[in-house]
Amino acid sequence: MAKKLVDDLEREGVLKSERVKKALLSVPREEFVMPEYRMMAYEDRPLPLFADATISAPHMVAMMCELIEPRPGMSILEVGTGSGYHAAVCAEAIERRGKVYTVEIVKGLAIYAAQNLERLGYWGVVEVFHSDGKRGLEKFAPYDAIIVTAAAASIPSALVNQLKDGGIMVIPVEEGFGQVLYKVVRRGEKTEKKAVTYVLFVPLR
């Protein structure tokens, strides 16, 4: 089932690199969804978690991972842990060589994600923190990449400031009556911002 999903994403042009393809095949999505949705784990759709959170659709996880240009040794910050699935895919995309720090504002979700990640052997590569992701995670900054998995009203300056020079942030932003996914690259004290596509995420809390 995972292979069919990955083949479909590759055919649709969402999956472009062998690195992200292997990452998606390596992470068992069914282990990160609620029990009642296990049979739907390899459908390309978001699925409900709890506390008004969702696990992102596989095509969106793939797209965001591709946009940060993953490579071994990277330091990645994820804002919005959810069930831990996206963080696990990022860890595989950097071949578990590097670090993924993930921040979740809902304590119950942070605990749930940490349990999932530990059970599947990601402890030591992925670290989960319960805190306000809009402020980033200054302790381990600067980062090669930041992935935000909830829609912000605007691009938080605290997150931009925690990017390395040349670092990439992928973030959905509320615009008008919709949301736009942006790829933001830090260049010294300035940023380059490129709109990627229209998206639909839960709001950043």
Swiss-Prot record:
A Gene Ontology BP annotation from the UniProt entry: protein modification process
Record Gene3D superfamilies: Vaccinia Virus protein VP39 (3.40.50.150)
InterPro entries in the cross-refs: PCMT, SAM-dependent_MTases_sf
Entries under CDD domains matching the protein: AdoMet_MTases
Catalytic class of the enzyme: transferase
Location within or outside the cell: Cytoplasm
Gene Ontology cellular component terms for the protein in this record: cytoplasm
UniProt-recorded Gene Ontology molecular function terms: protein-L-isoaspartate (D-aspartate) O-methyltransferase activity
Organism superkingdom: Archaea
Active site residues per record: 56
SUPFAM superfamilies the UniProt entry points to: S-adenosyl-L-methionine-dependent methyltransferases
PROSITE patterns reported for this sequence: PCMT
Catalytic activity entry: [protein]-L-isoaspartate + S-adenosyl-L-methionine = [protein]-L-isoaspartate alpha-methyl ester + S-adenosyl-L-homocysteine
Principal subcellular localisation of the protein: cytoplasm
UniProt-listed Enzyme Commission number(s): 2.1.1.77
Alphabetically ordered keywords of this record: Cytoplasm, Methyltransferase, S-adenosyl-L-methionine, Transferase
Family: Belongs to the methyltransferase superfamily. L-isoaspartyl/D-aspartyl protein methyltransferase family.
PANTHER family associated with the record: PROTEIN-L-ISOASPARTATE O-METHYLTRANSFERASE, PROTEIN-L-ISOASPARTATE(D-ASPARTATE) O-METHYLTRANSFERASE
NCBIfam families in the cross-refs: pimt, PRK00312.1
Primary role: Catalyzes the methyl esterification of L-isoaspartyl residues in peptides and proteins that result from spontaneous decomposition of normal L-aspartyl and L-asparaginyl residues. It plays a role in the repair and/or degradation of damaged proteins.
Protein name: Protein-L-isoaspartate O-methyltransferase
Species this protein is from: Pyrobaculum arsenaticum (strain DSM 13514 / JCM 11321 / PZ6)
Gene, per the UniProt record: pcm
